[in-house]
């Protein structure tokens, strides 16, 4: 997988990695390599982040969980290039080969959340929105949300509008 693609995948899923040590397997991201490509999944009990990308070369179907701290380091090492990252798995370790750098991390063992069941397959509802406006609205409403409290952002989708609200100990936000 290209370095910039892996970097983007990590950046778009790492926020949902749990910091709760009572479920150690969720303190990392699940990597799934199958006929669809590479899928990364992270969960923390409140959020689920998923990113899927096609991959050129794959040697079978397999999955493993990489600790969030290791992925943070991989993200820092990856550059904005199309050079390919080699990902190799062993019985207890994962090896990332990024250019001339090799990072070896232990695998997290345990039963990862059944994430496929958490996402509806045939949802008839489709939403089309202006990405810039949507992200700006999320940024405004999220100003009072702290990473520590992880207050949910509630979206109510109506005809021609999306109503976003959140309630935290600091106050309420609505847009």
Give residue spans per PLM region.
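DNA polymerase processivity clamps
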Residues: 1-52, 56-108, 122-175
């Amino acid at each position: 997988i290209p370095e910039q693609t892996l970097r983007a995948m990590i950046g778009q899923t790492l926020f949902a990695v749990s910091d709760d040590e009572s479920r150690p397997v969720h303190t990392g991201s699940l990597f799934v390599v199958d006929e669809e490509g590479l899928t990364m999944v992270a969960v923390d009990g409140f959020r689920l982040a998923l990113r899927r990308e096609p991959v050129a070369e794959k040697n079978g179907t397999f999955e493993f969980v990489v600790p969030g701290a290791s992925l943070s380091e991989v993200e820092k090492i990856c550059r904005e290039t199309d050079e390919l990252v080699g990902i190799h798995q062993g019985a207890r370790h994962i090896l990332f080969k990024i250019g001339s750098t090799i990072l070896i991390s232990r695998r997290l063992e345990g039963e990862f959340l059944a994430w496929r069941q958490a996402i509806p397959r045939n949802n008839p509802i489709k939403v089309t929105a202006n990405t810039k406006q949507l992200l700006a609205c999320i940024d405004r409403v999220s100003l009072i949300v702290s990473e520590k409290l992880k207050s949910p952002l509630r979206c109510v989708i109506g005809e021609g509008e999306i109503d976003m609200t959140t309630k935290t100990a600091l106050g309420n936000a609505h847009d």
